[in-house]
Amino acid sequence: MERPSVRSYSIRGSRITEAQRAAKDALQKVHGIEFTQQEINLSEIFPKSDKVIMEIGFGMGEATAIIAKNHPNNGYIAVDVHPPGIGKLLARIVENDLTNLKVIEEDVHVVLQHMIPDESLDGIHLFFPDPWPKKKHNKRRIVNEGFLALIHPKITKGGFIHIATDWVPYAESIQEVFAASTLFTGGVIEKPEWRPVTRFEGQGIDKDHAVNDMMYLKA
């Protein structure tokens, strides 16, 4: 699978500030991983980590940085395409002296296809992906049959994908996709205490949006 012809994200609204650009330019070579069409060795990147978790889409990076800080024994690879968020997360890495978090600027589909070895990820976090609420845009949602087929071989035996969304129709769609697959087992769970409530999530809660956490284990 190359980069999908129908993207699950939009670059609109990705205006980067001077501070974010400066952080991105200065820090990406140190705390980022450059995209390559060759597999990377996660054991070399995170030699002291008990587990390696991929964060797909991280907004402005607040939750990702908190999770990495609170779980120093895990290694985290954060993948996104939006320059402002990448610059902000790189700055957070420095501010919090995080040695267990790396950033990749690229479409996660091609990152998984080319860079991530099979059975090398202990888990995947997919928190608040774009729900694409308009029916004509539903095909742009990241969670679909092809996505499950892509991530399944990359996850270790007993590994997981944890998804959270505050858009109920999307939560229902996600559950339908997984229910139709034999690759994963699981369903809705209680929000774990370790997952921070981001500003974006808080805004949704203020609007009475119901947040659904879902956990699926590799079958």
Describe each region flagged by the PLM.
Residues 1-54, 65-69, 90-118:
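S-adenosyl-L-methionine
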Residues 57-61:
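Class I SAM-dependent methyltransferase "Motif I" SAM/SAH-binding loop
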Residues 82:
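Conserved SAM/SAH-binding beta-strand->alpha-helix loop
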Residues 86-88, 171:
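Short alpha-helix immediately C-terminal to the canonical SAM-binding loop
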Residues 143-157:
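A short glycine-rich, Lys/Arg-flanked "PGG" loop and its adjoining helix->strand segment in the class I
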Residues 157-165:
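Conserved beta-strand signature within the Rossmann-like core of class I S-adenosyl-L-methionine
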Residues 171-219:
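Class I S-adenosyl-L-methionine
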